[in-house]
From Swiss-Prot:
Cytoplasmic side: 1-28, 226-246, 309-448
Cellular compartments annotated: Membrane
Domain of life: Eukaryota
GO cellular component, one term: cell cortex of cell tip
Positions of the UniProt region annotated as Disordered: 351-411, 427-448
Main location group: membrane
Organism phylogeny: Eukaryota, Fungi, Dikarya, Ascomycota, Saccharomycotina
GO biological-process terms attached to the record: calcium ion transport; fungal-type cell wall organization
Protein name per its UniProtKB record: Protein ECM7
Induction: Repressed by zinc.
Membrane topology of this protein: Multi-pass membrane protein
Keywords assigned by UniProt, alphabetized: Cell wall biogenesis/degradation, Membrane, Transmembrane, Transmembrane helix, Zinc
Amino acid sequence: MVMSRIRDTIARPFQNLTALEKVVQWLRLGTTLLIISFGLALTVGPLSSPRTLYMSRLDTYSADITTGLFTVLRESMEQSTSTEENNGVGLTTSELYILTAYTESQIKNVPQYITVSLYGRCDSTYTMVEVFDSEGNMHSVKNSTTKSTCSSIGTDYLFDYREVLESLGLDIILDYAYNKIGSQQAESSAYTTYMRSLKHKKANVLHLLYAVISFQVCMLFFMIWYYYIKGRFMNALKERALVHINSLLSLVVFIGGLISSISLAWVNYTIQSRINTELEAFGFSYHLGVTWFALLWCFAGLISVSCLAWSGLEWCISDNGTSYGGGIDDKFLGYQAGVFTDADLDDETSYSQRYPQRQSTSGEAELMRNSDTMATIRKTSDVDLNSENDANTSLDHGNPTANISNGGKHEPFATREEFELQDIRFRSSNDSEESMQRVIKPSSALQF
């Protein structure tokens, strides 16, 4: 019994829906659940899997940096040493050897790549294994496995690539990359101000993303409540209120979700552009995280579909011409306003107003032209009138004060119109378009 009630309660929001309403319901439910799932993957995922769900990655392979740094230093030294003494020949072999050894020593402890997440970064280095060559000599070779050191800062974390290079001991790269730009101190101050503003913007956008996910959870609750009561009450005020609340929330989620998604993408694209412009010559490369950004764009697409499924359908497509006030619809249960009136009003209304004439059909006209039909009608009316007079006489003997008036209801039909009016009065209610026996559907087809 208890399990049956639980099953009925769970299945209730999915009952009494048309085929189109079921499609809309599953579209709304599916997009809502996916938005919540993707939102949690975007925000909570980097805490548990920072190496997988990262926003960006800075490749710092030692071989690439060695080549890039060596090229930059060689060009710089050739320009500075290209004088009349060496006839512009450039560096000697010994100088090139010294320069190569110097660059290798500078990047000895640099990680192979750095992954940047929402809350921090991970420095990853390939592990080294000792192997023997064919002559029996032991060498250190990089293994395919990596060793990562992760740090979590918080929601206001932003990848400061200059600070990272300085912490890794790559001061030589900073000197050669930024000492040619006017005053180095002025450039550093402008860079610090710019990164501080980006950090503040990124923190605000992340908080907005949290709010969007929270609103989506509220939408899930209101949606279940709405389908739980849909079409089960004569007063649809609560039902329509829930629809408009969810439509408004979907619009807020759409605006906030797009702002947060575009802003996070813009911050990462900005940093990528600056790094590739300033450090690409030194062997650095900056890439965006494929998995995390795929989730981000799917999240943005789903909130757009959800907004169309709620706000679009309810405010742009649905037939909302029906009044959803506190009263019951005039046509509910087949009653039409002004057709059935009070007895007092009937007494004050003329006979022709209460029973308006209608055009007789060809069959009825032919029937009334038949003299036998009219004779039968008159005969029947006379019999009814005599029976009523006898009843009045009997009542007068039993109770002298009793006085029952026929009120003109059983008078003979003098004209064809009176016969037709009598026929109208005794017609079946099934002939009316507003019959009480028709099937009642409180919700219309275009109200989702």
